[in-house]
Amino acid sequence: MQIANTLPELIGNTPLLRLERFAPGAGVLAKLESFNPLSSAKDRAGLYMILDAEERGLLQPGAVIVEPTSGNTGVALAYIGRQRGYRVVLTMPETMSQERRSLLAALGAELVLTEGARGMGGAIERAKELLESTPGAWMPDQFNNPANARAHYETTGPELWRDTDGGVDVLVAGVGSGGTITGVGEYLKSKNPNVKIVAVEPAGSPVLSGGKPGPHKVQGIGAGFVPQVLNTSVYDEIIPVENEDAFQTGRRIGSTEGVLVGISSGAAAWAALQLAKRPENEGKTIVALLPVTGDEAYAAARELARTEGVLAGVSSGAAAHAARILAQRPDMRGKTIAVVLPDTGERYLSTGLFA
């Protein structure tokens, strides 16, 4: 029998999808990290960092996990940490989406919001203050924790190599904490030094390219500084992506492939598409690591409540979002689209979904 006893046992072994409708004939594959239990690549890092801390005696029973996070690491730490009996306190910029905050609260995390203009730097400073003032606290410190990158060296990288039969030519990945591109990149280059690793960052905060940090809307990447865990020698090229290109590409993947992805996934896919257009990459296999699912279902549910006065659940939000994508197609102009909203939203009132 294949029965998991705990949710973290289901982390990893996510599928590869050929994006043939999104990029016909381009040889672009998507590593769908949204198939992890809580829908992101951070599930891997969260599990590895907690297990590593337990093994080294840094996490004692009843301890408090404190971490600055832009969202998905917090989701992973919340559900894994709470399941293992820890209190989880997360600091994050106030610019993070209400949907993400609601999800974290629903998982039992305590949120501390910091000034948005200070970016992740402000969240990190606040987390350090809490670490010093909270007895029994431990900080995973994803930006500096080697277990973050090791999670991807030992799992994501081998999966990509196995599933492509060693045929991956180019890896495209966004850079947030740097753990994913470092771990996967180091593993792939250990198998084939000729594999090209491409880093993706927000054009509004091109720190890796030598620019200045700044505000941007590509949640999950672009921390505004160079993380210590990031191996800056592992990537061969950096591609900055504009906010709108990330948004539009994410929507295109949804409408062409039926896969709802987040903004950072849209950024990685956009960069992969630009690489596929280059003559030197003709016939090559390009893998875009899509780290997260979209928050569109949550956002659509909130929008239904605000604009139509309809208290709809998340599954209804997903249906409404899909209908909106259909309505934007030229072939649907003038047509009547009926949407079935299968659930009400009263069960989500306690999570802050409609706050």
Short names for language-model regions:
Residues 1-355:
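PLP-dependent amino-acid enzyme catalytic core
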